[in-house]
Curated annotation (Swiss-Prot):
It comes from Salmonella typhimurium (strain LT2 / SGSC1412 / ATCC 700720). Residues 1-23 form the signal peptide. InterPro entries: SBP, Sperm_putr-bd. PANTHER family: SPERMIDINE/PUTRESCINE-BINDING PERIPLASMIC PROTEIN (PTHR30222), SPERMIDINE_PUTRESCINE-BINDING PERIPLASMIC PROTEIN (PTHR30222:SF17). Keywords: Periplasm, Signal, Transport. GO terms for cellular component: outer membrane-bounded periplasmic space. This is Spermidine/putrescine-binding periplasmic protein. GO terms for molecular function: polyamine binding. Belongs to the bacterial solute-binding protein PotD/PotF family. Coiled coil: none annotated. GO terms for biological process: polyamine transport. Its main location: periplasm. The gene is potD.
Amino acid sequence: MKKWSRHLLAAGALALGMSAAHASDNDTLYFYNWTEYVPPGLLEQFTKETGIKVIYSTYESNETMYAKLKTYKDGAYDLVVPSTYYVDKMRKEGMIQKIDKSKLTNFHNLDPEMLNKPFDPNNDYSVPYIWGATAIGVNSDAIDPKTITSWADLWKPEYKNSLLLTDDAREVFQMALRKLGYSGNTTDPKEIEAAYEELKKLMPNVAAFNSDNPANPYMEGEVNLGMVWNGSAFVARQAGTPLEVVWPKEGGIFWMDSLAIPANAKNKEGALKLINFLLRPDVAKEVAETIGYPTPNLAARKLLSPEVANDKSLYPDAQTISKGEWQNDVGDASAIYEEYYQKLKAGR
């Protein structure tokens, strides 16, 4: 999840409707989601339409959500929103259950291009909610975007101490692995080490790591080039910063946040109703406009303004998407990535 939006929503626990202590399993739904990921008033609308009260709480990372589900095994949550390879990880570990798509009458609204990704073939365990990508950010007032075509351009010596990288081990290594011609999902220790050695060469060019909002350093004039999330770049442009998105020839880094039902959910039927509600075009449009990231809902996209719907940084064409790579679970190799990443940052 790439967390920055036009609006700041309340974090932590938010109870909508009556207390869980006085609610039965079927008329209360426990929804655990990313901070800033639901527009104000939307869950109240769901409650008004269905009678199901939503107990809403938020998290800041997949790791936090995963640990909470591992800790509370008594069905503490009915709906969660894991990202890309966490869907893969959680389905393999039996933490999320198969979704009865016959009860999702709005499933057909989803863009076929956003379905059947490697982390969940056939979407048996997850339903796309929001997606996005990491690409190259360029301040067009300082650098001609036409001169930047590849991840390799970030290694050029003229950009010493002027780049921004996202503070994300998998993303940073995926960039280097793609530059070297390897898969960004490799589990080969030698390939990961090669990426580490390549990234060491990049460090003199790096001015900052940022995953709170990678667009901020661009907006504040601290950097003019580097990695950026396409949604935050779009919002930055709307705020007046000429932050262009360049899709590198090696391919962008794609991610998706999906709706999933924990294996021990107590209100599966309520979760399915909320998923179906969130798949409505009018609702998905509101979510996308609030968050500032692309919606996988094709019917909702048709409701967006032409300025947004036709923006190629938000909605790249099929060829650009096909060149990119979706992150998959790398199992035990994640520890190797993290070890090298910490060494990389410590050695700056």
